[in-house]
Amino acid sequence: MRNSSLRDASGSNDAQVPHKTELLNLPDHVLTEVAKRLATNNPVESAENIANFSKSHRFTRDAVRTEPLEKFSSRLKILSRNAKLLSHAVRHAATLPDGEQLSEAQLSQMRSEVATRPVLGVAYTHQDGQPEERLSGNHLDHKINNIPNLVFNVAEPIMFNEISALEVMAEVRPIARSIKTAHDDARAELMSADRPRSTRGL
């Protein structure tokens, strides 16, 4: 759901008012279910959708702050921030002492690995606030907590010219894969989360 999709085909917001009113009349647990469906397999889209939904009204903001959505957003912030850092590190690969040995195709593959496969680096720019330092929870949270260390361990040698440009790809690929897998697992967990009990009006 892009920003433009919040408007009708004529570009007018007026046609949306009745629909918005009907949406806000839904019970809390149904609003949360609606919000969950805004998390697509495209993390940039997910970040935009959830942010726009949250800004619509107090009820939609509360729906986004319920346990399944809030946890997903926290995970997305950490993953997207580190995908962005990994992407920055890869862009410096060509500046390494042996960087001239990298072909344009190899450089393109590196950039694609961190910027296209998980497009999370872009998603980071669509979120409010800083990511939590650490998540506390299940096995997936522990995996996500470890990703910043993995990114740092490859980014630092690149920044200080302590790694061969030809070795960067082998170091980056599993980290990029871990980030993408963690995002996919986080979304799957979100979609399978039980509905919260409605508390509005209590």
Curated annotation (Swiss-Prot):
Partners and quaternary state? Component of SCF(virF) E3 ubiquitin ligase complexes. Interacts with host VIP1 and SKP1A. Interacts with Arabidopsis thaliana ENAP1/VFP3 and VFP5 in the host cell nucleus.
For region Disordered, the annotated ranges are 1-21
Q: What keywords are annotated for this sequence in UniProt? A: Crown gall tumor, Host nucleus, Plasmid, Ubl conjugation pathway, Virulence
Its lineage reads: Bacteria, Pseudomonadati, Pseudomonadota, Alphaproteobacteria, Hyphomicrobiales
Instruction: Report the subcellular localization.
Output: Host nucleus
Query: What's its job?
Result: In the host plant, component of SCF(virF) E3 ubiquitin ligase complexes, which mediate the ubiquitination and subsequent proteasomal degradation of target proteins such as the host VIP1, after its implication in T-DNA translocation to the host nucleus. Required for the formation of tumors of a wild-type size on certain plant species only.
Residue ranges, compositional bias (Polar residues): 1-15
Primary location class: host cell
Q: Where are the transmembrane segments?
A: none
Q: Name one GO cellular component term.
A: host cell nucleus
Species whose genome carries this gene: Agrobacterium tumefaciens (strain 15955)
Q: Which residues form the F-box domain?
A: 20-42
What's the name of the protein?
Answer: Virulence protein F
